[in-house]
Regions:
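Intrinsically disordered, low-complexity N-terminal regions enriched in serine/proline/glycine
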Residues: 7, 28-30, 67, 77-79, ...
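Detector for short helical micro-motifs
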Residues: 18-41, 47-50, 139-165
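Intrinsically disordered, low-complexity regions enriched in small/polar residues
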Residues: 10, 19, 31-33, 46, ...
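Positively charged, structured surface patches that bind polyanionic biopolymers
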Residues: 1-23, 37-41, 90-143
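A general marker of short, structured functional hotspots
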Residues: 4, 25-27, 64, 96, ...
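Winged helix-turn-helix DNA-binding recognition segment
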Residues: 34-95, 158-198
Length: 198
């Protein structure tokens, strides 16, 4: 988000639909946008990224720190960074998760002119804190993740019907959404219930 004047992040359609990037793709992209400095760099540690996304850091094999590194590695392969650390090396060496690293963003990939889903910062904050926001509500939050909620919300936003003189809507079957973004139909239904509360 250039100049920090904008109060939203734009999630490109190609990120939303790329199931190879894992379900963590939108939350990591949102983090990079939210933490973007004026010179288009982001300094971060995976521990900070975990804390920001309200998760406990865990750098063991297959756990959250490694999952985040895997997404960062794929983003680097896809050209989202002009320069970045060797994420493959970080994965193999279980790099200290509190060590700060820096990426130089490829602004052509981040400043997308069209085909994106907008997530407003106030929505992002509510979603990151969804367990607190929904405390006392009769909603199943077991094994739910803010990464899943952000992924579905960005999908809905990129697919909104923008026909003049018609209400904004996104008409999709849960099965189609599941095929498009890789979340199960059951999770999609639960996330829709959560989004309705916001």
């Amino acid at each position: 988000v250039k100049n920090n004047n904008l109060n939203y992040v734009k999630i490109p359609r190609e990120i939303i639909y790329d199931k190879d990037l894992s379900s963590k793709r939108v939350i990591i992209f949102s983090y990079l946008c939210a933490r973007r400095s004026l010179d288009d760099t982001v300094a971060f540690s995976t521990t900070e990224l975990c804390h920001w996304s309200k998760l406990k850091p865990n750098y063991r094999n297959g756990k959250i720190n490694q999952k985040y590194y895997e997404v960062l590695l794929l983003l680097s392969h896809y050209g989202y960074f002009e320069s970045c650390p060797d994420f493959e090396k970080c994965l193999k060496e279980n790099t200290n998760s509190v060590k700060y690293q820096q990426v130089q963003l490829n602004i052509e990939k981040f400043d997308v002119p069209d085909s994106f889903g907008i997530i407003y910062f106030d929505e992002l904050d509510k979603i990151l804190n969804f367990k607190e926001e929904l405390k006392g509500k009769d909603i199943d939050l077991a094994r739910m993740s803010s990464a899943y909620i952000l992924l579905l919300l960005s999908y809905i936003r990129v697919n909104l019907n923008r026909i003049e003189d018609k209400p904004l809507c996104c008409y999709r079957y849960f099965k189609t959404i599941s095929e498009d973004i890789g979340l199960s139909e059951r999770y999609i239904g639960r996330i829709v219930d959560i989004l309705e509360e916001f």
